[in-house]
Amino acid sequence: MKFTELTVKEFENFVQNPSLESHYFQVKENIATRESDGFQVVLLGVKDDDNRVIAASLFSKIPTMGSYVYYSNRGPVMDYSDLGLVDFYLKELDKYLHQHQCLYVKLDPYWLYQVYDKDINPLTEKNDALVNLFKSHGYDHHGFTTQYDSSSQVRWMGVLDLEGKTPASLRKEFDSQRKRNINKAINYGVKVRFLSKDEFGLFLDLYRETEARTGFASKTDDYFYNFIEHYGDKVLVPLAYIDLNEYIQHLQESLNDKENRRDDMMAKENKTDKQLKKIAELDKQIDHDKKELLQASELRQTDGEILNLASGVYFANAYEVNYFSGGSSEKYNQYMGPYAMHWHMINYCFDNGYDRYNFYGLSGDFTENSEDYGVYRFKRGFNVRIEELIGDFYKPINKVKYWLFNTLDRIRNKLKK
């Protein structure tokens, strides 16, 4: 085996292997996003004796104190069950970094520590051997965190395993609320379409509304546009919306049908108890449809023919479709836009051969008092599998300068207080 810099083509060919647990940050398109942020990029990997790539990682070189912080965001990509390969990679990476002006290195691999069912019952053993291997190479582990941290990627995820399933069989595994709300969205006639680059502002409108409502930390417009500009068809932006013209027409046709059926039944003499009950039920449905029709007509007058309900940013790579971020309109939540969007994207996975639908981030605190308990409950209702990643690892390379860097950082933080 040999540790080496890779060409873009070598890197891309390797990470396109769907059997590798790779992340959307470890794709060739991310080279351009990192460079547009002002960072140099280097592709490092391992080749076997037949010159085949067996490990790869995209590193950003972040200028710091006359040196570089080397950060492989969700890298490296490899068969991490092969501890011998991981050991070789870390050993050779250390040699490379000592020769290339590295201050310290950060790795947060897309590697599993433990897997749980939706109720946090363990399905696998803890992968302590992998964590201990990093530590044996001098890496500091950031810990098994159970909260969001703006300096780290999420460590917990909710994932749907689609392998061997169909949309119908998968839907049977959802809880009653998920099934009911998906059905509501379908009955309302909610549609989903993908936004073009020029329409991305529609996503941002819903995202900013949700940000203001929930108080969650958000990304800047430029952050999103950087991906939109460079990721091409690897970034997907669905929009769930309702066309009130179509909905009102459907409601009116349904109302007319029910009124006609009720009139026919009322015209009959000597009605049975069963017929009277049916008439009473139709009266309730007619009353409901009239209220819905009035509300929809008023909304069309005040808010327009098209109501944008929910939108999201998704990344698709060889391994999975990943829900990165989203927003929705609270005013129109009765139309179940987020459910329509997720159901559409789950079906997109089936249609395009993906075995994983990743709802992505969770804090790891699954108690009712946690900051994202509502998010967990939402994802839990889809019968997700909870995946815990191994976390962040740091290693100082230039130890003297690293000590000085941390000392100055602590002083700056004290001065800010």
From Swiss-Prot:
Keywords: Acyltransferase, Cell shape, Cell wall biogenesis/degradation, Cytoplasm, Peptidoglycan synthesis, Transferase. Its EC number is 2.3.2.18. One of its GO terms (cellular component) is cytoplasm. InterPro entries: Acyl_CoA_acyltransferase (IPR016181), FEMABX (IPR003447), PG_Glycine_Bridge_Synth (IPR050644). It is found in: Cytoplasm. It comes from the Bacteria. GO terms for biological process: cell wall organization; peptidoglycan biosynthetic process; regulation of cell shape. It holds the Pfam family FemAB. It catalyses: MurNAc-L-Ala-D-isoglutaminyl-L-Lys-(N(6)-tri-Gly)-D-Ala-D-Ala-diphospho-di-trans,octa-cis-undecaprenyl-GlcNAc + 2 glycyl-tRNA(Gly) = MurNAc-L-Ala-D-isoglutaminyl-L-Lys-(N(6)-penta-Gly)-D-Ala-D-Ala-diphospho-di-trans,octa-cis-undecaprenyl-GlcNAc + 2 tRNA(Gly) + 2 H(+). GO terms for molecular function: aminoacyltransferase activity. PANTHER family: AMINOACYLTRANSFERASE FEMA (PTHR36174:SF2), LIPID II:GLYCINE GLYCYLTRANSFERASE (PTHR36174). Belongs to the FemABX family. Catalyzes the incorporation of amino acid(s) into the interchain peptide bridge of peptidoglycan, using aminoacyl-tRNA as amino acid donor. This is Aminoacyltransferase FemB. It comes from Staphylococcus epidermidis.
